[in-house]
From Swiss-Prot:
Role according to the record: Catalyzes the complicated ring closure reaction between the two acyclic compounds 1-deoxy-D-xylulose-5-phosphate (DXP) and 3-amino-2-oxopropyl phosphate (1-amino-acetone-3-phosphate or AAP) to form pyridoxine 5'-phosphate (PNP) and inorganic phosphate.
Keywords tagged on the record: Cytoplasm, Pyridoxine biosynthesis, Transferase
The organism of origin for this protein: Thiobacillus denitrificans (strain ATCC 25259 / T1)
Gene3D superfamilies: Aldolase class I
InterPro entries, per the entry: Aldolase_TIM (IPR013785), PyrdxlP_synth_PdxJ (IPR004569), Pyridoxine-5'_phos_synth (IPR036130)
UniProt GO cellular component terms: cytosol
Residue sites binding 1-deoxy-D-xylulose 5-phosphate per the record: 14-15, 50, 55, 105
Name by which UniProt lists this protein: Pyridoxine 5'-phosphate synthase
Amino acid sequence: MGGAMSIYLGVNIDHIATLRQARKTRYPSPVEAALAAETAGADSITLHLREDRRHIQDADVTILRQTLKTKMNLEMAVTEEMLGIALETRPSDVCLVPEKREELTTEGGLDVAGQQAKMRDACARLGDAGIRVSLFIDADFAQLDAAHAAGAPVVEIHTGHYADAASDAARAAEFERIRRAVAYGRSLGLTVNAGHGLTYHNVQPIAALPGIHELNIGHAIVAQALFVGWKEAVAEMKRLMVAAAG
């Protein structure tokens, strides 16, 4: 992409919607949060329309598609319903994620290698509509090869195992896996993003990795916003990332 920026921040607004849905109120508004995040330095807005609609609702997607000034990164499962919504809404980016993510925390990313035809079909349909497709995968060479073969121009490396590591040694091992995966993905010509579980305390090593394009971060920013305010929480994360990326 070039430009002066060395790394980009995608702010995930799912948990603004979680807070709203807890009481089925009209506030806090994910749309308002997204627009404020943009003014605070977010380079894109990420939202996950789940099949159970537990946080983001269809109306949020529709309104945000019309109002965002940056780009929308719509996370979704690889189902006919979701593909239909994406093709109708036409966000700039779609990130395909595991169907039941909460039950797959140990596995993390999509098994692209195990469902190559399905992934190739989804990538082709979205790509033909002018949507840039990203696949959310583990830091695994076989999955990177499969993502490349499926025709996805972008991958998002799952950083959850790194974030959740119980010891320094385990974290160092996970970090090395991610580092190698980023380098390998770049060698295949893929744009490599990363996300899941990133916080103000663990983001900088990932942001400093050569070849990382964008980090998608949500929960940590929403939590920090309780204490410092939403715009400051977004700006603070962006500052940490840019400082690390040099």
